[in-house]
């Protein structure tokens, strides 16, 4: 009887070691996630050797934040979530969070749209200056025939008219010069700066973010690895284990026993993220992540669908099971709902790490 009692105690102990308490998962994972910030802009190197710059491009809206020189372009700022996967400062996230995901086949189409949009802007600018020039010409004609106008006033009016004409003619040259540019021979370059903010720290501006470099990307599976420049994961930060085997398929004896006597380790999944980036994350106590749970509703070879609510900003979040094992990297929500989301299965992150 004593041996039977001890055996039961041993089994219960094994089961208790299987699944992890939700609060413990939340506490541990919160120390390993980071808020990822991406400041980016585009450069179009035209076939004539000149460059134009813009903040972003959308097929429906066209270009926005256009500038003729690099110093005046306003960078677009976006946010996502990342998590530590090594002790040397490596962080996993989505490729679309930290890199340009425009495919080469779309570049020429985008350049053509940029040029068309630029022509419209040049035409608008020309018309604006042409109107000013006509007004200045009228003032010049009056000053030229009015004996009461002093020479100083006349010369100021003339110089103003000439300056307006020079600006107007410059935009005319730009407009007709664009017609000679071949979109197929132009190139889009993506410039960006990636940085992170640690969970549970104070962030008041972009200078409080820590710089990183993008080291690896897998655009086919929307995965990326970034790394702290000093290659040192801070002490006390949880490092997520990226298993060589898939936790959704690999069950230890303890996992099987726990599933029979309690809950399957994959019956519930948890996500730690920064929904809406700093909009929700910034609190009086500093940057705070959100913790949500749900269940897996569908599996494919490369993706999971689960009922975890999320908002933009959660891209790149770690998704773990009830045993605390990393099973997926969150990357997209279904249209018109925040209640069902997709994640990339962890095996593809492992493949990227091993490259």
Label each PLM-derived region with a short phrase.
Residues 19-22, 45, 77, 203-207, ...:
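Flexible, gly/ser-rich surface segments that form the specificity/activation loops bordering the active-site cleft
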Residues 36, 82, 89, 93, ...:
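Terminal peptide-recognition signature
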Residues 17-95, 181, 185-199, 206-215, ...:
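N-terminal activation segment of mature serine protease catalytic domains
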């Amino acid at each position: 009887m004593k041996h039977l009692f001890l055996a039961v105690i041993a089994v219960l102990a094994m089961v208790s070691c299987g699944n992890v308490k939700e609060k413990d998962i939340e506490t541990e994972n919160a120390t390993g996630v980071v808020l990822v910030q991406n400041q980016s802009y585009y450069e179009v190197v035209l076939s004539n050797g000149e460059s134009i710059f813009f903040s972003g491009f959308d097929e429906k809206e066209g270009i926005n934040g256009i500038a003729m020189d690099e110093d005046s372009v306003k960078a677009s700022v976006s946010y996502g979530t990342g998590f530590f996967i090594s002790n040397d400062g490596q962080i996993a996230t989505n490729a679309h969070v930290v890199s340009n995901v425009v495919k080469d086949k779309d570049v020429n189409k985008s350049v053509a749209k940029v040029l068309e949009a630029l022509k419209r802007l040049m035409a608008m600018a020309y018309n604006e200056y042409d109107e000013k020039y006509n007004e200045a010409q009228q003032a010049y004609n009056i000053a030229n025939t009015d004996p009461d106008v002093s020479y100083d006033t006349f010369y100021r009016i003339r110089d103003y008219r000439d300056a307006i004409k020079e600006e107007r003619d410059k935009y005319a040259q730009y407009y007709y010069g664009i017609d000679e540019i071949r979109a197929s021979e132009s190139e889009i370059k993506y410039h960006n700066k990636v940085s992170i903010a640690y969970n549970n720290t104070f962030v008041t501006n972009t200078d409080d973010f820590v710089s990183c470099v993008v080291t690896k990307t897998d655009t086919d599976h929307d995965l990326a690895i970034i790394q702290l420049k000093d290659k040192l994961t801070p002490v006390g930060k949880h490092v997520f284990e990226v298993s060589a085997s898939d936790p959704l398929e690999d069950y230890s004896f303890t996992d099987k026993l726990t599933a029979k006597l309690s809950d399957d380790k994959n019956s519930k999944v948890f996500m730690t993220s920064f929904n809406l980036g700093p909009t929700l994350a910034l609190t009086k106590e500093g940057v705070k992540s959100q913790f949500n749970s749900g269940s897996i509703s569908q599996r494919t070879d490369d993706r999971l669908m689960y009922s975890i609510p999320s908002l933009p900003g959660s891209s790149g979040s770690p998704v773990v099971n009830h045993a605390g094992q990393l099973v997926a990297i969150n990357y997209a929500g279904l249209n018109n709902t925040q209640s069902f989301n997709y994640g990339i299965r962890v095996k593809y992150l492992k493949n990227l790490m091993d490259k």
